């Protein structure tokens, strides 16, 4: 039997759970009856026993796709429009973020698994002579399906410590991220930021710095994947902040039309009040809110201005929704040439440099958090950060990386000193 070219089958693990149907340019999601009896809604906006608006389906799927230049490379490879969500998902469906596998209706889940080894020498050669195409496309196949704009590829780290590409039923376990000429030392920046987050006891993805010749890279362990045996990867379903809010990817910033004068007042994108409100849908709302609070305050302390709606994710399972580890933490102040406006306002403040007791009190009130809780967590994080930054470290830095690290330390220490002075006023200041 030849499958319908306008129907995609959705699998979670070995279970076929739903169909996506394209009718007159609209996408429709329908759960299988067996899954409705035994499963769960994979997103709050793709409910089990209600009609699902096509707009919800379109937004959910678009948030599975890469963004920016990586998306442009993929549409050229597949000869598709970037607006053809159905076609792009069909092309990338074997290795989407989380646990979903999305395939044409006439195509079964692959039973075979193949590991395509990538040697250090091969990757170094690609990086030395790279453009976006030859970094993403290997053996005529795109090796990127995760969302985001940064240069990166999906890889498998096998039991022998070798890097490669998973094919067939073998999906990626790690993401390998690279820096560009525009963002020198970005790999070191993110490594330091993730290390500091761990020092502050935030739940973050595990990362390692790698070098391929003169090219640094960040190897990020996927928290939605775990290699069980040589050919078996256990996957865990998750959604990002945009999917949680039922928003398209371009609404990942609170000021979804930008911050120019005529549109700055439009704030329909993902925001901190929306995230804290969504925490009420999680298994443990109080714990989730405290974890998000620590993420927000840590981002303030290290100048991670670009903490947007696609840089936070939630696990979704039979037992409910829970916060996933944090990722993509970067000190943006190290790059003065880039935008330093906050992705999500603290209260009404988008200026990342103008964060004082007033803004933190406004943030607490706006998100319905006790000011005393915000002050307590801020003081705790400052203590952890300053201790970590003053300790001796063994990071095997090379060239000018040591100077970069010192500058990073100075910026964060100065921020900590300033906000520690402001901290006692958070509970008493009048708005």
Question: Which residue stretches match the model-derived regions?
Answer:
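Phosphate/dinucleotide-binding and metal-coordinating scaffold of catalytic cores
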Residues: 1-431
